[in-house]
Amino acid sequence: MCQFLAVALKDMKFLPVEKILKNGTVVTIRQAIKKDAEGLLQTVSRYMIDSDHLVTSIEEFNPTILDEKRWIEALNENRNSLLLIATHKKKIIGNINLNGETRKKTRHNAVLGIGILKEWRSIGLGEILMQCAIDWAKENLTLETLWLHVFATHFKAIGLYKKMGFEEVAVQQDFIKNDDNSYSDNLVMKLSVKTN
């Protein structure tokens, strides 16, 4: 079970929690703070290089440490947004974010993004990060629906998302143009976090 705060205390929405991965390694899941900006940038840059399933390329990813601090601060201040990081021995190994919509008519929605270093994949970290974010969203007073976008050919990720309760709602054909000039479909998935 992940621990979170229904009401933020000094921008903290989520209490740190230790989790055990399938290989027995203990990791800490906690809310990101501005001091994490440099480490988070390094981690994101590393997993962007190792993944063929991200829309943003490493050449396009060029925020400064100040930009990253502002992004972290914005997510922490927005009551329907969350940014969690996974750490091992104080090194960031993955992250998940819920980017909550800010407009009145759409703020019940958040878009989920997740990334994990290559050497930490396939040992349960993605499921743990997703469960913590989903549990937090279920208790959030504003959020009703989580959305995500995924390459339609990223079957491993799609399997995890379905396991976590997401359902396919749309396919954008040929939405992604790959480096080799081939096309990939974008799959839109949704999870309702409020039961009426």
Provide a role label for each language-model segment.
Residues 2-23, 181-196:
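Terminal substrate-recognition subdomain of acyl/acetyltransferases
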Residues 42-59:
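Helix-loop element at the rim of GNAT/NAT acetyltransferase active sites that forms part
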Residues 116, 122-136, 159-163:
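Conserved acetyl-CoA-binding loop-helix of GNAT-fold acetyltransferases
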Residues 130, 137-149:
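Conserved GNAT acetyl-CoA-binding A-motif
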Residues 32, 116, 150:
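Hydrophobic adenine-recognition pocket in adenosine-nucleotide-binding enzymes
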Residues 28-40:
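A short beta-loop-alpha structural element at the N-terminal edge
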Residues 145-150, 162-182:
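Conserved catalytic-core motifs of GNAT/GCN5-like acyltransferases
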Residues 48, 60-119, 130, 192-194:
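Acetyl-CoA-dependent GNAT
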